[in-house]
From Swiss-Prot:
Belongs to the ETF alpha-subunit/FixB family. The keyword Transport applies. Part of the ETF-acryloyl-CoA reductase complex involved in the pathway of L-alanine fermentation. The electron transfer flavoprotein (ETF) serves as a specific electron acceptor for acryloyl-CoA reductase. It holds the Pfam family ETF. The keyword Cell membrane does not apply. It comes from the Bacteria. GO terms for molecular function: electron transfer activity; flavin adenine dinucleotide binding; oxidoreductase activity, acting on the CH-CH group of donors, NAD or NADP as acceptor. This is Acryloyl-CoA reductase electron transfer subunit beta. FAD binds at residues 305-333. The gene is acrA. It comes from Anaerotignum propionicum. It is found in: Cytoplasm.
Length: 367
């Protein structure tokens, strides 16, 4: 079934696909519900969470605490664990019946599989891996004026436009592209985890949230795969998004790569519970694994403390860390762009400065 421009006016509400794992919501759900609340307010529509699973009604109210007006729970034993065929079938069936205007999906492994499949079935567009969303044109223009190097002073914008404006990195993060889907609905977007700020939980809003449970039907013909068992692999992956302290390294460690990484690890340990990140140049050079990358093509982070060691500060990197509460930069080049967004900047050789930082932190803790 395809929806086109003739049907657009019949579509209502902002939807967020909420991902559960083993009966528990994930942090990305709360980020998207929080962002969806802003978009729904801009559009003057309701915010609806769509939750697929089995016996997950009890966790649905939590989504209301972050802004959902309503949560639709689709319940079936085969939805307990994610499978492409079951989830795509159920989600598309509900969408075709309810006709949401916008669907936001987290750009997780599951979301990146589910989103494109549903968009293809619904014959609509999907913008993947978004880092910014707007409906109100005034807010979009404000975003451009503060986050773009473009001179927009002579540009004109259709201020009456109410399409969802979806911004995402393009060409390896060298450009930011804003995409709209004006002729088809629903408008679909996958959103990068960690880029949207989670709102404060409200118990009052949670109690006011309406939860509607739908017991769906799935036939054997609908199910091409079946989850028999899940075996979890023990793998150490750095959690950049959830970290409160991040010490990142850049190309400035090139004269002694292993020594530079070791210094970053020692500094992170000195702070306490810090983790090590890296710029794209570091990851592309193979000095750190890909899950350590900070920036538009890596993770977007906002820790309490972000330390940039030997990072020049390309716009792609700054876009992924500039919302950190406190930014400390160390670079031997006093003109490095990283200093433009740093709260504290130190010009000099990081191999000499970082040991002094470590000693100062230890002395402060022992005082």
């Amino acid at each position: 079934m395809a929806f086109n421009s003739a049907d657009i006016n019949s579509f209502r509400d902002i939807w967020v696909f909420c991902e559960q794992r083993e009966g528990k919501l994930i942090n990305t759900d709360f980020e998207l519900i929080s962002e969806g609340r802003k978009l729904a307010d801009e559009r003057g529509s309701k915010l609806v969470g769509i939750l697929l699973g089995h016996e997950v009604e009890e966790i649905a109210k939590e989504l209301g605490g972050y802004g959902a007006d309503k949560v639709i729970v689709c319940d079936h034993p085969e939805l307990k664990f994610y499978t492409t065929d079951a989830y795509a079938k159920v989600l598309c069936d509900v969408v075709m019946e309810e006709k949401p205007e916008v669907i936001l999906i987290g750009a997780t492994n599951i979301g990146r599989d589910l989103g494109p499949r549903c968009a293809a079935r619904l014959h609509t567009g999907l913008t993947a891996d978004c880092t910014h969303l707007d409906i109100d044109m005034n807010k979009y223009v404000d975003f451009l004026s503060t986050s773009s190097t473009l001179d927009i002073s002579s540009m004109t914008f259709p201020m009456e436009d109410t399409n969802l404006k979806m911004t995402r990195p393009a060409f390896g993060g060298h450009l930011m592209a804003t995409i709209i889907c004006p002729r088809f609905r629903p408008c679909m977007s996958t959103v990068r985890p960690g880029v949207m700020k989670k709102a404060e939980f409200s118990q009052e809003m949670a109690q006011a949230c309406q939860v509607v449970t739908r017991h769906v039907n799935l036939s054997d013909e609908d199910l091409k795969t079946k989850v028999i068992n899940i075996v979890k692999e023990t793998k150490k992956i750095v959690d950049l998004i959830g970290a409160e302290i991040i010490v990142s390294v850049g190309r400035g460690i090139s004269k002694d790569v292993q020594g530079g990484i070791a210094l970053a690890e020692k500094l992170a340990d000195a702070f306490g519970n810090g983790v090590v990140g890296g710029s794209r140049a570091v990851i592309d050079s193979g000095w750190l694994p890909a899950d350590h990358q900070v920036g538009q093509t890596g993770k977007t982070v906002h820790p309490k403390v972000y330390v940039a060691l030997g990072i020049s500060g390309a716009i792609q990197h700054k876009a992924g860390m500039q919302d950190s509460e406190l930014i400390i930069a160390v670079n031997k080049d006093e003109t490095a762009p990283i200093f433009d967004c740093a709260d504290y900047g130190i010009t000099g050789d990081l191999f000499k400065i970082v040991p002094m930082m470590i000693d100062a932190i230890k002395e402060g803790k022992n005082a």
